Amino acid sequence: MDLTEFIKICRLLYDRKYVVGSGGNVSIRDGNLIYITPTGLSLGFLTKEDICIADLNGNIIKGKPTSELNMHLKIYQNKDSINAVVHTHSMYCTAFSALDKKLKLVTPEAEMVVKKIAYVDYFPCGSLELAENVSECIEDSIILKNHGIVTLGKDITEAYIKTEVLEEVAQLNYIMNNLK
């Protein structure tokens, strides 16, 4: 499988500071397999050799995947149309989530791309409760209390664009709140 776009998106997430350090994780589905980022490695320095592989039952074929593997698996198991998951700790979305503030979709692009946002209460990172609550959301753009966002797409580019637009929405909401 060609993972060039996967690596490109991971580096974009890092370069645009949607993730810092070794935070965040990304996966794509290819049939019964998922390709997922490893634990403890910065997305900005990811190579093809670093990418982990698991099957949809959670059997690890290669590498040591992110602690959020269960969240990715549950999403794929519950949503046949989803082939990519992006989880970031983007600054503005995370700040709004920590304050329990809902975001207004203020631009036409946000209405078209994000459509509607789901909000999930806080559950510990990597927990089965987090995985189950995220995977039960109907929406493809999800804000996690104190923990960033998850965006879903038919491919990795679509999931990435939702991340980018959702973080812009949070920035615009911040600006609007401070201009009042």
Curated annotation (Swiss-Prot):
One of its GO terms (cellular component) is cytosol. This is L-fuculose phosphate aldolase. Belongs to the aldolase class II family. AraD/FucA subfamily. It catalyses: L-fuculose 1-phosphate = (S)-lactaldehyde + dihydroxyacetone phosphate. Transmembrane segments: none annotated. It comes from the Archaea. Its EC number is 4.1.2.17. It is an enzyme of class 4 (lyase). Substrate binds at G24, N25, T39, G40, T66, S67. One of its GO terms (molecular function) is L-fuculose-phosphate aldolase activity. SUPFAM superfamilies: AraD/HMP-PK domain-like. NCBIfam families: FucA_Meth. Homotetramer. Its cofactor is Zn(2+). The gene is fucA. It comes from Methanococcus maripaludis (strain DSM 14266 / JCM 13030 / NBRC 101832 / S2 / LL). InterPro entries: Aldolase_class_II_sugar_metab, Aldolase_II/adducin_N, Aldolase_II/adducin_N_sf, Fuculose-P_aldolase. Binds 1 zinc ion per subunit. The keyword Zinc applies. Involved in the biosynthesis of the coenzyme F420 which requires phospholactate produced via the aldol cleavage of L-fuculose 1-phosphate and the NAD(+)-dependent oxidation of (S)-lactaldehyde. Catalyzes the reversible cleavage of L-fuculose 1-phosphate (Fuc1P) to yield dihydroxyacetone phosphate (DHAP) and S-lactaldehyde.
